[in-house]
């Protein structure tokens, strides 16, 4: 169970329409449209809903899929995994442990050292650049 619980009205007041659709309604942004899919700045990618430090820029890589991709979470305890059988597929959904926000999915076709590809919606993230 998420540590941070808010009403639907509170989430709607905090997030813009796209952030709400992605994080609270398990939406997906179109490939190559999110603000972080091609970002190369150093920093920490935080949950847009609660600020949890989910991924570091050092683990981000270009997977060619059009979404920010990471091979390792900042702390595995901050990411929860769930079986997702929507759209006739079986995938592994990843959510923020602290607030339950839908982040994206994890696949087993990533690079070393983990072989994993955390395919994350930009709308679920906020980049805190190093030194700021």
Curated annotation (Swiss-Prot):
Gene Ontology BP terms: protein repair; response to oxidative stress
Metal-binding in keyword set: yes
Entry GO CC: cytoplasm
Catalytic activity: L-methionyl-[protein] + [thioredoxin]-disulfide + H2O = L-methionyl-(R)-S-oxide-[protein] + [thioredoxin]-dithiol
InterPro entries, sorted: Met_Sox_Rdtase_MsrB, Met_Sox_Rdtase_MsrB_dom, Mss4-like_sf
The MsrB domain, residue ranges: 8-130
GO terms of molecular function: peptide-methionine (R)-S-oxide reductase activity; zinc ion binding
Residues annotated as binding Zn(2+): 47, 50, 96, 99
Keyword match Oxidoreductase: yes
Cofactor(s) in the UniProt record: Zn(2+)
Free-text cofactor note: Binds 1 zinc ion per subunit. The zinc ion is important for the structural integrity of the protein.
Gene3D superfamilies reported in the protein's UniProt record: Peptide methionine sulfoxide reductase
Pfam families: SelR (PF01641)
Class of this enzyme: oxidoreductase
EC numbers, comma separated: 1.8.4.12
Keywords: Metal-binding, Oxidoreductase, Zinc
Catalytic residues of the enzyme: 119
PANTHER family: METHIONINE SULFOXIDE REDUCTASE, METHIONINE-R-SULFOXIDE REDUCTASE B1
Family statement drawn from the similarity comment of this UniProt entry: Belongs to the MsrB Met sulfoxide reductase family.
Protein name: Peptide methionine sulfoxide reductase MsrB
Gene: msrB
